[in-house]
């Protein structure tokens, strides 16, 4: 939503219209010369999937980009670093009693969704140009309806999914974008280490990453 944009970004945005659907406010406008729809999906995979489908159905978007924060699963990532999705997977999808590995979505050709290479490349260049001191990493995003804040769970996600960061929405957007044949990119600032200290680091970085 527009309140999450910096002052300079707001000055570069021309607001055309605003509509509320499924409890979410979709703002259409011109952002740096591009026709854009900005929206806050809410927390969790269902909210994100609903939001993405509305963007596809009602606004006919040609790409979707999700921004936010995530917990680090990669020891090379520090708080404040940026992760650009190479791919995304839902870590809480589990029908293993029926014979499929954890993370595999039954009756789907894909369970690991690949981000658009052009969007990844453009985002990496923009990130490095905006602040060369910030580490911008391309890696796997894993998502589930859980806030990861234990070393045990973190190690499980690393060993099982080889993820670089964990959050609660990105893979749902990727899943929905895949079903609609729409390119996607997830951009996440590392807010915490996804371990026993996660609940302390998250609120501070959430505020600064939105500023």
What does each model-identified segment do?
Residues 1-10, 14, 207-211:
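Single conserved hydrophobic/aromatic residue that forms the stacking wall/gate
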Residues 7-11, 15-114:
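Metabolite-binding pocket within alpha/beta catalytic cores that recognizes anionic/polar moieties
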Residues 37-42, 140-142, 187:
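Active-site-proximal beta-strand elements of phosphoester/diester hydrolases
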Residues 68, 141, 169:
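Short, conserved catalytic/metal-binding motifs centered on acidic residues
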Residues 73-161:
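Mid-sequence, gly/pro-rich, charge-dense loop/helix-turn segments that line enzyme active sites
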Residues 148-186, 191:
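A C-terminal functional module that forms or caps the active site or interfaces directly
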Residues 194-209:
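His/Asp/Glu-rich mid-to-C-terminal helical/loop segments that flank catalytic regions of hydrolases
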């Amino acid at each position: 939503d527009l309140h999450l944009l910096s002052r300079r970004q707001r000055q570069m945005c021309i607001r055309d219209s605003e509509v509320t659907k499924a409890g979410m406010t979709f703002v259409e406008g011109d952002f740096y010369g591009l026709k854009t729809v900005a929206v806050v999906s809410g927390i969790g995979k269902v909210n994100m999937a609903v939001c993405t489908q509305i963007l596809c159905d009602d606004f006919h978007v040609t790409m979707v980009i999700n921004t936010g924060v995530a917990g680090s699963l990669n020891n090379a990532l520090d708080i404040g670093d940026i992760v650009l999705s190479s791919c995304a997977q839902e870590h809480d999808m589990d029908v293993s009693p029926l014979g499929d590995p954890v993370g595999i979505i039954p009756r789907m050709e894909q369970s690991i969704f690949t981000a658009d290479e052009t969007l990844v490349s453009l985002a990496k260049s923009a990130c490095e140009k905006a602040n060369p001191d910030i580490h911008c990493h391309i890696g796997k995003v894993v998502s589930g309806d859980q806030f990861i804040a234990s070393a045990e769970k973190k190690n499980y996600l690393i060993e099982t999914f080889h993820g670089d960061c964990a959050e609660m929405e990105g893979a749902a957007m990727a899943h929905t974008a895949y079903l609609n044949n729409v390119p996607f990119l997830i951009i996440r600032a590392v807010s915490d280490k996804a371990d026993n200290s996660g609940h302390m680091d998250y609120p501070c970085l959430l505020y600064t990453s939105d500023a």
